[in-house]
Amino acid sequence: MADKMWGSEPFWGLGYEWDPDWFYTERQKELRALLIELCEKELRANAKRSDDELLYPRRNLEVLGEHGFLALTVPEEYGGLGENHVAYAMTCETVARYGCASTAMCYVMHMGAVNAIMLRPTPELIDRYIRPLGSGKIGTLSYSDPETGSHFWYPISSGAERMNGGFKVRKKASWTTSAGFADFYVVQTTSPDFSGYDDLSVFVIDGEHVEAQPALWDALGLRGNQSGPLEVPDIEISGDQIVGPVGDGAASNDESVDPWFLIGSSSVWNGIAMGAIDIGKRHTTRKRHVDVGLRVADYPTIQDYVGEAVIDTNASRVFVHSVADAMDRATENNTKQLAPGEFARADFLHWAWQIKFAAAKNVARVVDKMLHACGGSGYKRDMELERYLRDAKAGWVMGPTNEVLRQFVGKAVLLGFEVLDYWNQTFNRRAVENEVKKLDPAAKRELAEQLMTQADEDEAKKAQPAKA
């Protein structure tokens, strides 16, 4: 096995023997070596500037674009590298580990937008948004909503209507990575002629039609993300800018947006964890206590910290790569074109929830333990560990939050997938009946009258003719 290099010197962290290389093709190993080289030459140095100055990492993204990574999973016939889910996981992890976590997260959102378009490609979308990726065009996803928080799949503050052969789109988002900096935005809104529940649609909005406030972003970590509020203020777009048919949004979530985002973001958290371990190894093997003649790495407690961190992080890495590999198998190595109504990645969505939970939980613990291992030196900014620590804390709270995910999994295991009421449409009959039992007869009659009035109003609304 070749030595892992950092410039002209052997890498000072963990070697390739601690990486899950059995998942990778020879080409993917070459891509990883190229990424490490790019991180050493430029990306890692730029990470400090992004963190210090709240600077959007455009230059780092341009570097990735110069080597084809902005079109990593795009078929070669459209100018991409034609790679798969495993290569994507490797890329996100590698950039976060050796380079810049903010760049890695912006990259995740960029690839989320790219793959949402590639789920339902049209010649117009390909020519307008996919082929230009080679010239450094950057996309992002805008799916959050100020009214629903981390329940990003429920866009209340949005809408679209048909107009002049195209659409008028309005969108408000509380969090959008690359807001104000991306060249195009893949957004989700309620559909034209919204029929309720999961009737959602996906559109691509050009950057000049988006209003953003990047100056408001000043966070604990991932300080280059510029993940600020965004608005699309009733913009008219052409009919070519819808992604998939009207009403395809929920299917797009399950088949593209969620799987790609969860694989990518989980890989970022794993990369941050490995990067912190790399720094911990470098410090503890070099720092000596002259009075006892030992390096910090010679103490059993430090060995325990590092050993457990490596074991837990590699368990998470293999978990992520396994789910990515399963999606590769289901999609014929990311080459299968699915028609609306067909699913492949969505069959593994409940596994994708688990990898995000595991990776985010693990990285928060690992960075703390590496700080303990490095002691006061790790608390200082010049070691970089404190930046990794701050970046890591985004994992747990980034939507879907770990609280949401573990409830999804617990509910699905105990009660079945059908109880996962994403759009708040199914009532809990047991809870309702239990609450009604507490009412006296007068209160029950009052509630019944109120419900009958609401039922009459709902029936009247349904009877109204639809707008042309």
Give the predicted meaning of each segment:
Residues 3-10, 374-468:
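Glycine-rich phosphate/cofactor-binding loops in nucleotide/flavin-utilizing enzymes
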Residues 8-24:
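Short, contiguous pre-domain boundary segments
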Residues 47-52, 314-358, 371-379:
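C-terminal helix-coil-helix/basic helical segment that borders enzyme active sites and/or dimer interfaces
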Residues 48, 52-66, 70-177:
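Glycine-rich flavin
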Residues 172-213:
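A short core secondary-structure module
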Residues 174-180, 260-265, 395-398:
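Glycine-rich phosphate/pyrophosphate-binding beta-alpha loops
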Residues 217-314:
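Glycine-rich beta->alpha junctions and the first turn(s) of the following alpha-helix
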Residues 258-262, 295-309, 347-358, 386-394:
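Alpha-helical scaffold segments that form or flank carboxylate-/histidine-based iron centers
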